């Protein structure tokens, strides 16, 4: 079984209880055989333990189609995802999210916190979730109730 999981924070970056709950849930799920765990958070910091899951930064998922060459994508996405992953996600944008401000790659910036514009960030997170839901292969989606 494949589960696509969404959270808002992940250790060691704890802002409330959600990160701790996400860690326990993913750690327990990872003990199941043949259960890959892609776990989406708005902004990874790079020091999260990914030994039992794959963290996907919502800030690296394109939501607006931008025509960029391979080398540019490789340089900008280094350490986040491969150019092939980027193009696969970009080619699975099914809705017009051009109302959302994006960077040159069509990705949305996230604070990685609980900012004053939290509702806007949640709306942008929905756009990322839509792209991932169309692009990735999974059997079930897990998301906390307020996401």
Segments predicted by a language model, with ranges:
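A short, glycine/small-residue-rich beta-strand->loop->alpha-helix junction that serves as a flexible
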Residues: 9-21, 47-50, 118-120
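Short His-centered aromatic/hydrophobic patch
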Residues: 122, 143-147
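Glycine-rich phosphate-binding loop signature in dinucleotide/nucleotide-binding domains
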Residues: 134-138
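A conserved catalytic-core segment of Leloir-type glycosyltransferases
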Residues: 34-133
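Short beta-strand segments
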Residues: 7, 39-41, 142
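Extreme N-terminal starter segment of soluble prokaryotic enzymes
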Residues: 1-3
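Short amphipathic alpha-helix
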Residues: 19-30
């Amino acid at each position: 079984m494949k589960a696509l999981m969404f959270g808002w924070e992940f250790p060691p970056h704890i802002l409330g209880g959600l990160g701790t709950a996400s860690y326990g849930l993913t750690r327990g799920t990872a003990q199941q055989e043949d259960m890959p765990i892609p776990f989406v958070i708005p902004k990874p910091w790079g020091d999260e333990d990914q030994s039992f899951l794959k963290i996907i930064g919502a800030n690296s998922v394109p939501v607006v189609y931008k025509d960029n060459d391979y080398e540019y994508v490789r340089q900008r996405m280094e350490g986040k995802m491969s150019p092939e992953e980027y193009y696969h996600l970009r080619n699975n944008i099914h809705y017009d999210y051009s109302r959302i401000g994006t960077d040159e790659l069509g990705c949305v910036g996230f604070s990685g916190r609980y900012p004053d514009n939290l509702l806007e960030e949640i709306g942008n997170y929905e756009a990322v979730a839509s792209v991932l839901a169309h692009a990735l292969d999974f059997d079930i989606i897990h998301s906390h109730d307020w996401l």
